[in-house]
Each structure stands twice: as C-alpha cells, then as structure tokens.
A protein has these predicted regions:
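A low-complexity, Ser/Thr/Gly/Pro-enriched, surface-exposed linker/loop concept
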Residues: 4, 29-68
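Active-site mouth loops of central-metabolism enzymes
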Residues: 234-242
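Catalytic and substrate-binding clefts that recognize carbohydrates or anionic sugar/phosphate headgroups
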Residues: 65-228, 237-238, 250-255
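Flexible, glycine/threonine-enriched loop-and-boundary segments that flank and lead into catalytic domains
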Residues: 243-249
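Active-site pocket-lining segments that scaffold enzyme catalytic pockets across diverse folds
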Residues: 259
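Short, Gly/Pro- and small/polar-rich lid/capping loops
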Residues: 2-13
C-alpha cells in the first residue's frame, strides 16, 4: 500500500501497565479501562487491530496482589479478582466502585446483564446500515415481511432492528470483544489473527459517558471526518455583481478557507 494511505498506529502499550502470567495478560490502560487477554500458548498480540489503533496510554496508579491461585488488580475505579484459569464468569469478576446499581457493581466476565432477576441496562450501539429498514423494523423481501437483523442473519419472531451492545451502560460498566478483528500491518494491509486467543476490553466509567467515549476514541482513533474541500459551497445571491466584487468575494472565500 502507498505510504500516503498508511495510518499512524501504535499498538504497543507501556510495559509498566502490564500484569502477565503464563496464559493471561492484563493491561491497565486507564484507571477505568482494562485490556484482558487469554492464550493457551502464552502468545499475545501487540499489533494494532481494525478496532484498536493506539494502546500507548499513560500508566495509571494501580496495585497488584499476586498469589498462587488468585490475582487481584486494584485501581481507583475498579477491583479485579481472577483465579488464573480460562476466562469465564466463574473465574473472573470485576467490582466497579461507587455502586451505580442497587445490586452492586460486580461484573462477571462476559455477562451483559446484572441483578436478580437479570436485566440489561446497556444504552446500545448503532446499526451498520439502515438499508431495508422502516423505522425500527427490518423489512424483508416478501410483502410486509418483517424480520429482525442479528449479525447478518434474520429472525422472523422479532422485528426490532438490533443495535448491538454499546460503550455506555447505566450499570456503570460494559465491555467489547476484539478477539476476531483483523490485525493492521505496518504496510497498511490487514491479516487474520491467531485463533483461540481472547482479547477483551472492560470499561468501568460509571455514568461518565463522555469520558468513556473520549478514552475509547484515544484507543480506536478519532472519528474520520470529511475534508472541508469535498463539501463545497452553494452560493446563490441575486446581486448586481461587477468584476471587482466577484474578485473580492472569491478572495474572501480563500481567506476564510471555505471551498467554493
């Protein structure tokens, strides 16, 4: 790929942010964001991915308590407890401090709900496209046929458009799984990552949704914006222009950096 099309990425984190064992690795990116990796081979990924472009965060304050069968990581905002086995709800949980729910702030690995009875308070994400959608419904190929979109598939039993999990949750914590995204190479191309490796990011930002999105953008890269020059300007003014006033107008557009 041509150099001008290559992105400036930095997948490596700071060594002092890492807590690592034979088959696990935790990276404390901020006092509220944690990367969790598990690999049976003990091989971990430092290259950027399609989702994660930058892991070079300043190391926050945290403490580690490492025992034979128990690892604890404690920051100002969360407390992780892990028994050093394969990641599962039975082996890893994180307590979010400052209790944002009536049922406490404990998150069991992989859970998207909390409480008893279980409930989901995620504020949801976005749909990749609204093609063939009518309001909140997905419209199928048949007459008035309504189906739910779920990961590219459809479910005729429910017609809601699936927005997926978002980064903000009223329970104070959420996560996203980066295990399947492609690796970004230095030459700008992508390649599949090794199978069987778990790569999950935990976010425990409470109700500070702005801060959560802000740090996610540091991790994933800023939202790409259209350059101003592609937008142009439609100028319609019924005025008796002269050659001189035309020149003045166009020169002002140039001074203001407004495309014409």
């Amino acid at each position: 790929m041509e150099k001008q099309f290559c992105l400036k990425l930095n997948g490596k984190c700071r060594p002092e942010s890492v807590v690592q064992g034979d088959k696990y690795r935790f990276t404390v990116l901020t006092s509220q964001m944690l990367r969790m990796e598990y690999s049976e081979t003990g091989e971990f990924e430092d290259r950027p991915t399609q989702i994660v472009w930058n892991r070079d965060f300043e190391t926050p304050k945290f403490t580690v308590r490492d025992q034979e069968n128990c690892l604890e990581i404690d920051t100002e905002y969360f407390h992780l407890v892990y028994d050093k086995k394969e990641f599962s709800p039975n082996h890893l949980y994180i307590d979010v401090k400052y209790a944002f729910t009536n049922y406490g702030g404990r998150w069991y690995y992989g859970r998207t709900d909390y409480g008893d009875p279980a409930r989901e308070h995620n504020l949801k994400g976005t749909a990749r496209t609204l093609d063939r959608c009518d309001g909140e419904w997905y419209v199928g190929s048949g007459p008035l046929e309504r189906m739910r979109t779920t990961g590219g598939k459809t479910n005729r039993e429910d017609g809601d458009v699936d927005l997926g999990m978002g980064l903000c949750d009223t329970s104070g914590r959420t996560f996203f799984d980066d295990s399947e995204s492609l690796i970004m190479e230095e030459d700008g191309w992508v390649m599949p990552r090794k199978k069987g490796c778990v790569d999950v990011y935990f976010l425990g930002y409470g109700r500070d949704y702005f801060h959560a999105i802000h740090d996610f953008y540091r991790l994933s890269g800023a939202v790409p914006m259209l350059p101003k020059y592609v937008l142009g300007n439609w100028w319609s003014r019924y005025w008796k222009y002269t050659e001189e006033t035309y020149r003045e107008l166009l020169e002002r557009f140039e001074r203001e950096h407004v495309p014409f």
